[in-house]
Amino acid sequence: MNTTTSQIIIDNDMSNEVGTIMVITLCLVTIVITCYLLLQLVRWSFIVDIFRQIRTRCLQWTSRREFLQLDNMYYTNDSSVGVNTE
């Protein structure tokens, strides 16, 4: 009688594992099908254009358009600035 009870417990554990594996497999198949449909059905050029517009706006917001003219400054090259001390 003990072997039958232990066999039933083992069978229940196995059925739980099989059920878990089936659920995980079903989730993975659903994710793969969703990714495939996204790649096939979405107009990617539209999304790329939106990304470029957002990037351009961010660059415009963060870059400076006007610079103050300083009388006692001079530029020696693009990376260094000198100051007139006269």
Swiss-Prot record:
Domain of life: Viruses
Pfam families: DUF2701
Name the UniProt record assigns to this protein: Uncharacterized protein C15
Organism: Swinepox virus (strain Kasza)
Taxonomic path: Viruses, Varidnaviria, Bamfordvirae, Nucleocytoviricota, Pokkesviricetes
